[in-house]
């Protein structure tokens, strides 16, 4: 049995599917820009899973890389500066969410964003609030 068939069989029994996509999977291999073809395929697959009645969570990284590319900043030693990373992340996160919103809308789905940090998990109130937000989003579809 192929890996794809095995994964699909396992997913049939699951209520909630979490998919993690990293920076390198978001970027076009030649240009380093967002790879819209890959993103469209990803979103189409996620919407198909959602249409089968599953809860779907997409965990995405790449905000720093997208932001850096947006302002044409090369990766340098200065990227270690927290302020530089945060500025690139702020730019990139907005661009990522705009892209996801547009693609999900093509499939009549709504995208939402929950930004989480280590503190979201460690702090009881923050964890409670994040959990409630997820629960409400799942209820809303």
Locate predicted features.
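Nucleotide/pyrophosphate-binding catalytic subdomain
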Residues: 1-141
